[in-house]
């Protein structure tokens, strides 16, 4: 978001963000609330985008992170150049295979933590094929975004969900999966 100001108005940054995007703050708060081991782990970040989750995992001591995204050119340059990051852009997570991961890095068989923050698609559409392919993963941290889980008929103007009941139903359905 932006704000128009006068050219001569002094502007200062109160504090620098810890991560390359706000997504890192989201994951950090989850990891603080739920002590999931990250140090020395091999992780996969599905929906990496700019790399907020990837950055958070690295700062928490991850040994390697596979940064998977269907997009291209979004991953922060510092992360892209980090030898611990395996950038897998233009990669549809629904079609991702262990063989593809192994081609990218021999550490793929050691993936122990999957984090996911995706948009414009239900996480269930990604989870089903991923879980079949990567069933050995111990920890799964998923961002549940109601606007992509409830179905179009429950979405109002601006992409807001109109029905709390639909959100609860989608969450219950997901929980039973």
What is each model feature region?
Residues 50-62:
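Conserved SAM-binding loop of SAM-dependent methyltransferases across substrates and taxa
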Residues 146-163:
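Short, glycine-/aromatic-enriched active-site segment of Class I SAM-dependent methyltransferases
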Residues 44, 64-66:
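Conserved beta-strand positions in the Rossmann-like core of class I SAM-dependent methyltransferases
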Residues 1-37:
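S4-like RNA-binding module at protein N-termini
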Residues 167-177:
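Short alpha-helix
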Residues 39-49:
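Conserved class I S-adenosyl-L-methionine
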Residues 124-144:
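A short glycine-rich, Lys/Arg-flanked "PGG" loop and its adjoining helix->strand segment in the class I
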Residues 66-125:
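S-adenosyl-L-methionine
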